[in-house]
Amino acid sequence: LANSYRDFLNHGITPRIPRRGAVGEADITTITHIGLAFIGEEDVNYKGKVVSAKEAMDKEGLKPLHLQLKDTHTIMLSNSQGEGTAAILVHEVENLVKMSDRIFCLDYEGLNGNIEPMREDVNELRGLPGQIRCAARCRKDLEGSYLYSDNRPEHALQDPLTFRGGFIITGAVEDALDYVKKFLSIQINSPSDNPCIMLDKKDVFVNSNFETTSLVIGVEMLAIALAHLSRAVNYRLIRMCMPEFTHLPRFLAPRNGS
């Protein structure tokens, strides 16, 4: 069974899995399509086309899997579809956070913002991990900026909240991301079989280890945090298009926005 997963990956054969299944626990109804592909049934994505699993396997010299004891149980009883999607989400949000920091710094330079809120000692005083990390990255990105110059133009003492606390909002996203990564790592590295077979005890136990509430709460929290980040970026963009606020041409366009 493990070799079938390996062979499909190495030969570029991807089982087609429904996005949604029946209402119930785990991904039982959807990821059974992986098992069906392994035995030569159902369709797969292969070299940019949708073909039958049997056709793709024949072209790659692979033989359909002959399922043994517990193989079907192993394929079906997991949350691999949801967990795999969450893993992709984690990767994309990590990249988004890094990009968000850099865009925020560009906004801050365009604003001629007050850099005091990003001071290391100020953020250590609060103690929020994501906030501290984001502030540190922003300070690094702004190294050499005119914002640190003694000859910089006059600036406001307190900037609008989405500027003054923009990196803190990104930090909140990072805190939510840490939560998701913690529970995702636990779930993808532990079994969710029901019943579970414990070889050391030579026994079988009924359980509910397929329950994903901890991970689901984290993903929902991350979605809320991303909504806050999106709102903050939108408000900063609106501000940057206001000449009475930036003292720059309207919409940052030449000839006063015409």
Predicted regions and their residues:
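Acidic, glycine-rich active-site loops and adjacent beta-strand->loop/helix elements
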Residues: 5, 9, 21-23, 202, ...
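Active-site-adjacent bridging/hinge elements
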Residues: 72-76, 193-202, 240-244
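C-terminal catalytic subdomain
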Residues: 213-258
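Short acidic-hydrophobic sequence patches enriched in Asp/Glu that either
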Residues: 99, 130, 134, 258
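Accessory "access/gating" subregions that flank catalytic or transport cores
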Residues: 108-231
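Active-site cavity-forming subdomains of large catalytic enzyme subunits
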Residues: 1-125
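Short clusters of hydrophobic/aromatic residues that line enzyme substrate/ligand-binding pockets
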Residues: 44, 196, 252
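A short glycine/serine-rich beta->alpha loop
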Residues: 14-23, 64, 204-213, 252-258
